[in-house]
From Swiss-Prot:
Changing E72 to A/R: No gas vesicles. It is found in: Gas vesicle; Cytoplasm. This is Gas vesicle protein F1. Keywords: Cytoplasm, Gas vesicle, Plasmid. Changing D15R: Small gas vesicles. One of its GO terms (cellular component) is cytoplasm. Might be involved in preventing aggregation of GvpA1. Proteins GvpF to GvpM might be involved in nucleating gas vesicle formation. A minor component of the gas vesicle, also found in soluble extracts. Gas vesicles are hollow, gas filled proteinaceous nanostructures found in several microbial planktonic microorganisms. They allow positioning of halobacteria at the optimal depth for growth in the poorly aerated, shallow brine pools of their habitat. Expression of a 9.5 kb p-vac DNA fragment containing 2 divergently transcribed regions (gvpD-gvpE-gvpF-gvpG-gvpH-gvpI-gvpJ-gvpK-gvpL-gvpM and gvpA-gvpC-gvpN-gvpO) allows H.volcanii to produce gas vesicles. A minimal gas vesicle can be made in H.volcanii by gvpA1-gvpO1 plus gvpF1-gvpG1-gvpJ1-gvpK1-gvpL1-gvpM1; lack of enough GvpJ1 prevents formation. The same region restores gas vesicle production in H.halobium without the p-vac locus. It comes from Halobacterium salinarum (strain ATCC 700922 / JCM 11081 / NRC-1). Disruption phenotype: No gas vesicles are made, gvpA1 is still transcribed. Belongs to the gas vesicle GvpF/GvpL family. The keyword Cytoplasm applies. Induction: Part of a gvpF1-gvpG1-gvpH1-gvpI1-gvpJ1-gvpK1-gvpL1-gvpM1 operon, maximally expressed in early to mid log phase. Detected at very low levels in growing cells, at slightly higher levels in stationary phase (at protein level). Not detected in isolated gas vesicles. Gas vesicles appear earlier when grown in static culture, possibly due to O(2)-limitation.
Length: 213
């Protein structure tokens, strides 16, 4: 069995096993502990996994399963490709980043990320600025923070990520229902819950990924 570990995210210390397919076809997802932290991992035969659509989807699916496995679990997500030479190497990384990880867990405790895209016909037949202002106002009081994402097509009117408290999730869902009813001629894409990808900033050195000196 390979010793390499692919890492999806960090949670509060917990023994966790998930029956979900991981990156590179991994059949088991489990945790590696360091003090009060647990890394969600699976076995992999490389420390430099190729970024494919299939594996990016698997990475995201695992993180969503971690969130679903127990209501109100907080996850610090890792970006795709974080693989380590051994459990010992991973624990060393957790030791070095422990303060930052603990701070981030505290900052995002009890929250999830929700994505909202609104698409129109891509012309001037809809009042884009009015829609942007109205929807932003409706969702602002139900979220802790928000980020503007790229409007990568002329059809996009809104592309935002919202940081939402677990306790306001139902109210946020209802607000999206109201937006869909008000703008039934537009396409509303509502995704999540996700770990707060757009609201964390954790960096782990490449030399640590490969095992260091």
């Amino acid at each position: 069995m390979t010793e390499n570990l692919y890492t999806y995210g960090i949670i509060e210390q917990e023994d966790l096993e998930l029956d979900v397919e991981g990156v590179a076809g991994a059949e088991q997802v489990y945790t590696v502990d360091y003090k009060t932290l647990s890394a969600v991992v699976s076995d992999i035969d490389t420390t430099d996994p190729e970024r494919t659509d299939e594996d990016v989807e698997a990475h995201n699916n695992v993180l969503q399963e971690v969130l679903k496995h127990e209501e109100e679990r907080t996850v610090v997500p890792m970006s795709f490709g974080m693989a380590f030479k051994s459990a010992r190497t991973l624990k060393g990384v957790l030791r070095g980043a422990r303060r930052a990880l603990r701070s981030t867990l505290n900052d995002i405790e009890g929250t999830v990320e929700l994505g909202v895209k609104i698409l129109g016909p891509g012309d001037d037949t809809v009042p884009r600025e009015e829609i942007q202002e109205n929807v932003t106002d409706q969702l602002a009081d139900l979220s802790i923070n928000e980020t503007e994402n790229d409007l990568f097509t002329d059809r996009l009117i809104i592309n935002k990520s919202y940081l939402v408290d677990f306790e306001k999730r139902d109210a946020f869902d209802s607000a999206i229902d109201d937006v869909e009813a008000e703008y039934d001629e537009l396409t509303i894409q509502y995704t999540g819950p996700w770990p707060p990808y757009n609201f964390v900033d954790i960096h782990i050195g490449a030399e640590q990924q490969q095992g260091g000196r």
